[in-house]
């Protein structure tokens, strides 16, 4: 089972390896605005993998396949990794690590406030998922799940807002997260 989990984590890191190779000039490139490409790619893959993580709960519940129960935490941590890379790309590359500029930019730009809030939610879950906190994590699983859903909603809102135009891709993410949230609510009410 551990090898399967490792394989899935490696597969989910392929976009990051691809982006890294392009950044190093091994093949292709990052286009006319490489910083924007890196920020966008890490953010979008963080959102996609977060959605996959959320998809696992209804999959386990409705299919009753225990095999999938091992994947939410490692895949969720990969989503956090991409989100962290998204923030660090913005903070260290785009803003040159200047804390004052970053704070002013976040305060003055509404979609950055929303993105920052989503990042903080995932940061909390990432820290809480450490082995030492496992008993607390397991006891508060439903709260953690709510925080992850909040992060997903904030992430898709951040993406939609920063796009400044209506994009089909953003609509797909909104619809997917809405359906997953409804499934989750149905599962939660069915258990009570």
Annotate each predicted stretch with a short phrase.
Residues 1-192:
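Membrane-embedded alpha-helical bundles that constitute the cytochrome b-like, heme-associated redox core
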């Amino acid at each position: 089972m551990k090898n399967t989990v490792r394989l899935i984590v490696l597969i989910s890191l392929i976009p990051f390896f691809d982006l890294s190779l392009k950044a190093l000039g091994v093949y292709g490139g990052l286009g006319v605005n490489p910083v924007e490409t890196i920020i966008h790619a890490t953010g979008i893959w963080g959102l996609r993998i977060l959605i996959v993580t959320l998809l696992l709960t209804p999959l386990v519940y409705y299919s009753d396949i225990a095999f999938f129960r091992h994947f939410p935490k490692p895949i969720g941590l990969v989503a956090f990794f991409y989100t962290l890379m998204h923030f660090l790309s913005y903070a260290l590359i785009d803003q040159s690590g200047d804390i004052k500029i970053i704070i002013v930019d976040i305060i003055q730009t509404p979609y950055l406030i929303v993105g920052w809030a989503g990042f903080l939610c995932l940061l909390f879950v990432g820290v809480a998922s450490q082995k030492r906190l496992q008993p607390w994590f397991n006891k508060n699983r439903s709260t953690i799940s709510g925080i992850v859903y909040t992060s997903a909603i904030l992430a898709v809102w951040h993406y939609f807002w920063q796009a400044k135009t209506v994009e089909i891709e953003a609509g797909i993410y909104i619809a997917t997260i809405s359906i997953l949230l409804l499934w989750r609510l149905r599962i939660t009410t069915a258990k009570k």
